A protein has these predicted regions:
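Extended, compositionally biased non-globular segments that define protein topology
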Residues: 1-104, 111, 154-164
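Membrane-interface segments at or immediately adjacent to transmembrane helices
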Residues: 166-176
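Juxtamembrane/start-of-transmembrane alpha-helix segments at the extracytoplasmic/lumenal side
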Residues: 43, 114-119
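Cytosolic-side transmembrane helix boundary signature
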Residues: 122-158
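Internal alpha-helical transmembrane segments of multi-pass membrane proteins, especially GPCRs
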Residues: 112-115, 124
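Hydrophobic cores of alpha-helical transmembrane segments in multi-pass inner/ER membrane proteins
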Residues: 49-61, 120-135
Length: 176
């Protein structure tokens, strides 16, 4: 059964990037709004969405090609759903130390972290979107057409990224 009409790799990548930006960054936006209250900085807070979306989209467009697209997008959806749960609920920031800790955690410690809320995050932010990506019928264009689409998309996204960064450069610099 087909869930979606035929879609290009570029469009599918942009949709997944938008989904992840909108659903898996709750804690990030809560913290940003504490520093920059929405009432006083609505354009900057909204610009964060565009900034994250354009950054993630460019990164994904650079690595997603004909035969690896679904694998990468599905793996990313599953991982970000779980990471989002731990970030939203425990304030965990995933960096290289956290990844090292994952590999040294024993089974009993891991079982203590399981909950219905984690299952909810996994199903609705990871598993169901992953099934949709898996069932999506991708229109494969010629190599030249695919490269041209990616170049156009990446160029527009870099312009968006640079534009947002330049307009709000003082605000972005203060986040560092």
């Amino acid at each position: 059964m087909r869930l979606t009409k035929s879609i290009s790799i570029t469009r599918l990548t942009l949709i997944v990037s938008g989904f992840i930006t909108a659903t898996c960054n709750y804690k990030f936006f809560v913290e940003a709004i504490i520093i920059y209250p929405f009432q006083e900085n609505p354009l900057f807070v909204i610009s964060l969405l565009f900034w994250l979306f354009s950054f993630l989209s460019v990164a994904l467009l650079l690595v997603c090609y004909r035969f690896n697209t679904k694998f990468i997008l599905i793996a990313l959806l599953i991982c970000t759903s779980v990471i989002s749960y731990f970030t939203d609920n425990y304030g965990v920031v995933f960096d290289d130390n956290m990844i090292d800790n994952i590999f040294v955690t024993n089974l009993n410690e891991s079982l203590d972290l399981l909950s219905l809320k984690l299952l909810f995050y996994f199903i609705f932010l990871g598993f169901i979107p992953a099934i949709i990506v898996y069932k999506a019928e991708i229109t494969y264009k010629t190599l030249n057409q695919q490269l041209w689409l990616k170049i156009k998309a990446i160029t527009l996204l870099l312009i968006l990224f640079a534009g947002v960064t330049l307009v709000f450069s003082k605000s972005y610099a203060s986040l560092l």
